[in-house]
Amino acid sequence: MCEIARSRRYIVCMPVVGEYEPSPAEWVRDQVAAYEESNGTRANTLRDTGLPIIIVTTRGNRSGKVRKSPLMRVHHDGAYALVASKGGAPSHPVWYYNLLAHPDEVAIQDGPEPFDVDVREISGEERATWWERAVAAFPPYAEYQVKTDREIPVFVATPK
């Protein structure tokens, strides 16, 4: 379980502990703040799509600070797919590198309470299966893959 300090500058979420640095993107900062303040009852969809999101907490690869990213909710049998699409951009999202650098310091909030997860990048048949689930949950992922030359990475996150 996580506790957020009144100042919102620090978050304690074992094992993710440290100074929280909000995203430089205003819409991300606002969505994360509204989601957390409402225990997941507000700002729980991707903008105006009505499609559900989760908040993923990581440790910054370079800064070492706690970072938070809203990602599409792709859930199956208690596990989550974390799809590093970045809208089909040629490079991976920053949080991808955070997961690679600190895979043991990741939490997900899907509703009122965050929980710690184990994450691993997947490939082969397992990736293909999760990719199908991801596209079913958020069809634009298919367009993103066509748009980029890189294979969009997929991680599986399971509660600890």
Give the ranges of each region predicted by the language model.
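Short, structured beta-strand-loop surface elements
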Residues: 16-19, 86-141, 147-151, 159-160
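Residue-level detector of beta-strand face positions
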Residues: 55-57, 107, 156
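Short helix-to-loop capping/linker segments positioned immediately adjacent to catalytic or ligand/cofactor-binding
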Residues: 42-44, 63, 141-145
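Short beta-strand segments
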Residues: 50-85
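A short, polar/charged loop/turn motif at coil->beta-strand junctions and beta-hairpin connectors
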Residues: 47-52, 151
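C-terminal edge-of-domain segments
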Residues: 3, 7-13, 24, 143, ...
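Extreme N-terminal tail/first-helix region
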Residues: 2-47
